Amino acid sequence: MAEITAKLVKELREKSGAGVMDAKKALVETDGDIEKAIELLREKGMAKAAKKADRVAAEGLTGVYVNGNVAAVIEVNAETDFVAKNAQFVELVNTTAKVIAEGKPANNEEALALIMPSGETLEAAYVSATATIGEKISFRRFALIEKTDAQHFGAYQHNGGRIGVISVVEGGDEALAKQLSMHIAAMKPTVLSYKELDEQFVKDELAQLNHVIDQDNESRAMVNKPALPHLKYGSKAQLTDDVIAQAEADIKAELAAEGKPEKIWDKIIPGKMDRFMLDNTKVDQAYTLLAQVYIMDDSKTVEAYLESVNASVVEFARFEVGEGIEKAANDFEAEVAATMAAALNN
């Protein structure tokens, strides 16, 4: 039986990332053969990873990496926020973003086949990470955006990396692109323009907005406040030329009824029409970047601000950790009991 020295254990830990006891046990089982010990740890690690495969991993980090005219934003998940702050996990996320930006895969299948700096595939790296870190670690998704030499990337991460954004701006500079990415991180647009919203989606969202108004009106009635009117429209897509013409005619009739001189109408009507547009594009404002009030200049929408500086947004991608993942609502006492039972059975 070979002597299992502290030096040998340390060497195995450095090569495999295993804990002290796991490394020592592997060396004992392989009679001190470090290469066989590494293989044994890998096999055990894959078995552990397989046991964790059905767990829900809804925490984690985004990663953002710019490689010349290509940028990648990715999402990597872990089971707990604690592990998401682990240095090994953070390094894995950053390395993955770099490999994705450089490899330019077409889909997740191609991404998982990319070779990491360690020489293993991305998929194998995540199996190893799951075994080493002790939680299910999963590569969830990525987006690649390409630009021309004349365009600029805005790369931004927020809330400790839980949100990652890439934007492309034409006609501006990198500082403008970065500011837009900060806006996107905060305001959560899902598409660029109202033209990308589905007609039925707009109708459903408008109905939901009016439902909220109904609830508000119930509260207002209790304190004798006047009821708020329902919204007739929710998107610029619904504001046809006839609708806009009628709105302007209604404003003129209102001004006439108030006795306002016609010679000053031209100064009043534009502001009231702007108000009409804001009041009747609430769905656009919630979901489309160009319709949102710009957080860097709240006197303008993003679209109006970009026009004022002769710039435009070409594309953007925003990832937030856990979007669309249904987290398991575990009972804490039951979880502790299950953990203790598992420990007793081992």
UniProtKB/Swiss-Prot annotation:
For whether the record's keyword set contains Plastid, the answer is no
Q: Which InterPro entries match?
A: EF-Ts_dimer_sf, Transl_elong_EFTs/EF1B, Transl_elong_EFTs/EF1B_dimer, Transl_elong_Ts_CS, UBA-like_sf
- Keyword terms, alphabetized: Cytoplasm, Elongation factor, Protein biosynthesis
CDD domains given for it?
A: UBA_EF-Ts (cd14275)
GO biological process terms held by the UniProt record: translational elongation
Q: From the Swiss-Prot or TrEMBL record, state where the protein is found.
A: Cytoplasm
GO CC annotation terms, alphabetical: cytoplasm
User: Mind listing the GO molecular function terms for this protein?
Assistant: translation elongation factor activity
Region Involved in Mg(2+) ion dislocation from EF-Tu, annotated ranges: 80-83
Pfam families attached to this UniProt entry: EF_TS (PF00889)
The UniProt function text for this chain reads: Associates with the EF-Tu.GDP complex and induces the exchange of GDP to GTP. It remains bound to the aminoacyl-tRNA.EF-Tu.GTP complex up to the GTP hydrolysis stage on the ribosome.
Q: Which PANTHER family match?
A: ELONGATION FACTOR TS (PTHR11741), ELONGATION FACTOR TS, MITOCHONDRIAL (PTHR11741:SF0)
Q: Which family does the similarity line name?
A: Belongs to the EF-Ts family.
Q: Return the protein name.
A: Elongation factor Ts
Q: Which gene encodes it?
A: tsf
